[in-house]
Amino acid sequence: MRRRDLLDLLLLAAVWGGSFLFMRIAVPEFGPGPLMELRVGLAALTLLPLAILRGKVPLIARRWKAILVVGALNSAIPFLLYAYAAQSLGAGFMSVANAVTPVWGAVIGWLWLKDRLPLIRTIGLSISVLGIVVLVWDKLDFGTGGDGPAVLAAISAPLFYGIAANWTKRFLSDLDALSSATGSMIGASLILAPLAISTWPATPVSWQAWSATIALAILCTGFAYIMFFRLIASVGPTGAVSVTFLVPVFGVLWGVLFLDEIVTTQIMAGAAVILVGTALTLGLVRWPLSSGSKPRSV
């Protein structure tokens, strides 16, 4: 990996890690629906000029049905779940929970598209699930004022990312990333609009919340997508997906620096176990095999 690619990877991880920080700042004033509508709407406006310049709009229009599904699964639903969780959970916790996204992608691919899931990746999946258990062990309180619903929202959001990735692979594999991203943001904006309108804040929103929202939409969504596309073109999908391992680092760091969050031993242990499992699931780490042995598939 070239130095420029490494810098891009670090910058992208820092930006995506910051999305959890900005959600924590903005969601108390906007609420989940309006905040996520602004996120996808402003992101769409950021990407749309580039799509127009590259002549992608006719292609988006022809494939609008499949792209709309991506908008729901990859943006509207998971973004809304994270925004709901951000009302009570820390940025660091959510960024660690997000690290299981590639794991769900592998599982859904195995169940739906019959992709091979070698034994080593099955072990990685099991380890990641164990990491989630460690992470949420003492937070599943469903009593009044408990964090249980928020925790379920945070750990469910990556599942929809995994479904979206496989939907894209199944129905939109021939569509370029810019068209898919732009179209899905427009679709997500249309999906979230009714909820946003019906729950729009009745009181004025502070400039701090507006600033966090604009950063979340333009920097952490629109700009981040463009950076991610560039990384894929430069280092390939496997290299680009390694950003998964860096996002929790920055998510935790920003939470500590700007929100005075406390990094508990439980969060660190959960993060370590999840990241080891994710690395195995992605095939980025080779399990020591005896000479001449071959990994089995399930």
Residue ranges of each PLM-predicted region?
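Juxtamembrane helix-entry segments on the extracytoplasmic side of multipass membrane proteins
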Residues: M1-L6, E29-G33, E37, L59-K65, ...
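Juxtamembrane helix-loop-helix junctions in multi-pass membrane proteins
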Residues: A14-A44, Y84, G90-G92, I163-G187, ...
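Specific transmembrane alpha-helical segments of multi-pass solute transporters/efflux pumps
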Residues: V15, S19-M23, L48-N98, V134, ...
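Transmembrane alpha-helices of multi-pass small-molecule transport proteins
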Residues: E29-I77, W104, F160-A164, A181-T199, ...
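Helix-helix packing/entry segments at the starts of transmembrane helices
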Residues: M36-L38, S75, F79, F93-V100, ...
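C-terminal transmembrane-helix exit sites in multi-pass transporters
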Residues: T46-L59, Y82, T101-S126, V249-A269
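Transmembrane alpha-helical segments that form core, pore/gating elements
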Residues: L47, G105-V107, L111, F142-T199, ...
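Hydrophobic transmembrane alpha-helices of multi-pass small-molecule transport proteins
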Residues: L47, L68, I108, L117-K139, ...
